[in-house]
């Protein structure tokens, strides 16, 4: 008796060649709907599923494979006499190979499918056959990925059957595949049919392997890079690398942080970042000048940094950047001449990202792993209106200081807490990240600012990601000659801080919104 294969695929890639090969190896093929039409067109002998079940396909194909003569053929254990006896009694012939891929739910979602279209792309019979076959992998070979066709054919050609170890690998892949498929459906329906003020009791997320990595944060750690099942266009995961060696774990983390900063700026802007903190941000009327400002902000720390530009890289900008060692440059595009200049540096990584999709949604989830669990929050992308800010001091900020505050407030959001930043209206001057007390961060930012020219420091302001708990911060700020501060406010000692600012003639604005970053 010939061995039987059941083939039912949405993705027809490679299926004709595969079917021809297994026919030549003596296999009988059972097929469904569209798959049968393709095989018939190529004159590959096959049997329609309804010839096996004696039951017609119906309900626009919703019901065709959910039948005991199919699932019994997949689930029956060949090593159990009771199973084989039941199969004989009910005229169930074994199926030894299942080749199934599922309705294109993800592809339809990404194409903007309507709710009705999405519902019709929820595959029922396909996952059921895959799961039945995978459960019985001791006897059944199950294939859900066209990339595995060649491996299956090789084993069948050489050995006449597949090895148990290979069937085990394929079965595990099937359950990963169906779990991912169901996770996307659950994610879609949860967003489509939300329950107000009720959190989902289960969190189902799915990610696809984008890149294996040589190591993680340190050489002794293993790491891989996975991309969200529903891709985010403006992301390091969707970037296109056009030059240089592969990204490392730390490269990906830093590039992600730099991209998050860049999307908050509309003007031509350059962001320089090291170890998850900005070391230079510059905005100007053109991208070359923006680079000058970002570089001038901290010409020491920028060495070996990550650079994001929100405009095309020009030849002049590329020539300037090529003079120092940089790990990564990310931009919407590169002029031909700029690419020629930068490509001469073998180790630099050049990437492009679609900046037209940079706007973030507050619904966009930010997932952070902790021991034994996950923390999930929405992105800190709330749109703020400076007109709603409150001047807390007697001294009013000048128009120039207000412009600098707007710039500082955008930038400090991305400094690790306790985060302090000193800026003028177009570039960062000093960054004080990640200290366990706020006055420590203030001192670091002011020290970095002190070596800048008087011209650059004119109209400089200081931004703080959270409130000042004590007035000692203001004492340090006043010593440095800073005359304007932007911070959220909200401390029980706000009045002490306000009084200190009034004492020193410093203007201070409360935004009412904190921006911790851990």
Swiss-Prot record:
Domain (MGS-like) spans 1-144
GO MF, one example: phosphoribosylaminoimidazolecarboxamide formyltransferase activity
The reaction(s) annotated as catalysed by this protein in its Swiss-Prot or TrEMBL entry are: (6R)-10-formyltetrahydrofolate + 5-amino-1-(5-phospho-beta-D-ribosyl)imidazole-4-carboxamide = 5-formamido-1-(5-phospho-D-ribosyl)imidazole-4-carboxamide + (6S)-5,6,7,8-tetrahydrofolate; IMP + H2O = 5-formamido-1-(5-phospho-D-ribosyl)imidazole-4-carboxamide
Gene3D superfamilies per the UniProt record, alphabetical: 3.40.140.20, Methylglyoxal synthase-like domain
The pathway that the record names for this protein is:
Purine metabolism; IMP biosynthesis via de novo pathway; 5-formamido-1-(5-phospho-D-ribosyl)imidazole-4-carboxamide from 5-amino-1-(5-phospho-D-ribosyl)imidazole-4-carboxamide (10-formyl THF route): step 1/1; Purine metabolism; IMP biosynthesis via de novo pathway; IMP from 5-formamido-1-(5-phospho-D-ribosyl)imidazole-4-carboxamide: step 1/1
Q: Which SUPFAM superfamilies match?
A: Cytidine deaminase-like (SSF53927), Methylglyoxal synthase-like (SSF52335)
Family matches, as CDD domains: IMPCH (cd01421)
Q: Which Pfam families match?
A: AICARFT_IMPCHas (PF01808), MGS (PF02142)
Tell me yes or no: is Transferase among this UniProt entry's keywords: yes
Keyword check for Membrane, yes or no: no
Tell me which InterPro entries the record gives: AICAR_Tfase_dup_dom_sf, Cytidine_deaminase-like, MGS-like_dom, MGS-like_dom_sf, PurH-like
Query: Which NCBIfam families has this protein been placed in?
Result: PRK00881.1, purH
Record-stated family:
Belongs to the PurH family.
Description of its domains:
The IMP cyclohydrolase activity resides in the N-terminal region.
Q: What is this protein called?
A: Bifunctional purine biosynthesis protein PurH
Q: Which organism is it from?
A: Lactococcus lactis subsp. lactis (strain IL1403)
